[in-house]
Amino acid sequence: VSTGPSESEGDLRASDGRIPGMRGLATRQKLLDASPTVLDTVAYRDLNVVDIARQAFTSPATFYQYFPDVESAMLALAGNLSEAWHADLRKLITNRDWDTDPDSAAHVVAEGMLEFWTRHKPVLRVLDLTSMEGDLRFREIRTFLLAGATDALMDLAAEREIPGDPMASAGVVVGMLA
């Protein structure tokens, strides 16, 4: 059972159909890691293969061994981010002392969400832009990413018997912090 968007073995295949070995996967990851750095200096629509390859100290031809275009690389990067952070955003909420110090718990959650958004701003900006433009692939990734926090807040609201709809309450809080 899939828990959300993630890269399947087919997504990791090189352009010639091979599944990369350890060195190939390291090169692929280096290209993914270079993308947010470049996005700090250019808009998503201006992001290009040459700039990513240069930042990764490799060639555009190497980029094309792993990704057909910039959009595919961004989908992979955003998918990886959502997989890694889905559970972490949930833990950010559930691993708090809401009984004896709810104000401090809320403060830590807000700070944690804002820190996450700041640290991953380039990729999250792309998720927001492409989602608003109607790209369902990016919207699905963004929704899955935020679902960890939303579900945890919904559970917390239901558990504490907060008046109103727990889903609405959770959605408002996540919307304000996202």
Q: Which sequence ranges carry the predicted segments?
A:
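N-terminal intrinsically disordered/low-complexity leader segments
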Residues: 1-26, 161
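Generic hydrophobic, amphipathic alpha-helix propensity
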Residues: 23-35, 52, 77-89, 149
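Helix-turn-helix
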Residues: 30, 34, 38-72, 76
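Hydrophobic alpha-helical bundle segments that form small-molecule/ligand-binding pockets
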Residues: 94-99, 119, 124, 131-136, ...
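Short amphipathic alpha-helical elements of helix-turn-helix/winged-helix folds
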Residues: 34-38, 116, 176
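Hydrophobic alpha-helical connector segments
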Residues: 72, 76, 90-119, 166, ...
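Alpha-helical DNA-contacting segments of helix-turn-helix folds
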Residues: 39, 67, 73-81, 127, ...
